Amino acid sequence: MQVLVRDNNVDQALRVLKKKMQREGIFREMKQRKAYEKPSVRKAREKAEAVRRARKQARKTAIREGLIAAPKPKPRAVAPRRPAAAPAPASSPTTTA
C-alpha cells in the first residue's frame, strides 16, 4: 500500500493511510490474527457474519419496499443549558441609628 507525502505533511499522509487500511479491512484482519483461531470456530464466526449480513440486507430491502417502517432516528444528546446568570442584587446602604 502506498501513500504520497505532499509538502512534508506526514499527518495528512497518516490519515490517508489509516483510511485506506480501514477500507481494505487490514485492521480487522490484524486483530483476528493476533491469536490462533480453530477452523471450527472460524467457520462458525464466518457463518454468523453471513447470517448477520443477510438479515441486514433483508431489513434494508423491506424498508425500501415499504413492508416495514423505518426505525425512528435516535434523539441527539443535547447538553443541558446553563441558567442565565442572575444580576447581582443592588446593595442598599445600611443606616445605623
Swiss-Prot record:
Region named Disordered: 37-97
GO molecular function: structural constituent of ribosome
Cross-referenced InterPro entries: Ribosomal_bS21, Ribosomal_bS21_sf
GO cellular component, as recorded: ribonucleoprotein complex; ribosome
Compositionally biased region (Low complexity): 76-97
The keyword Magnesium belongs to this UniProt entry's keyword annotation: no
Keywords: Ribonucleoprotein, Ribosomal protein
Similarity comment text for this entry: Belongs to the bacterial ribosomal protein bS21 family.
PANTHER family documented for this protein: MITOCHONDRIAL 28S RIBOSOMAL PROTEIN S21, SMALL RIBOSOMAL SUBUNIT PROTEIN BS21M
Record protein name field: Small ribosomal subunit protein bS21
Organism: Methylobacterium sp. (strain 4-46)
Underlying gene: rpsU
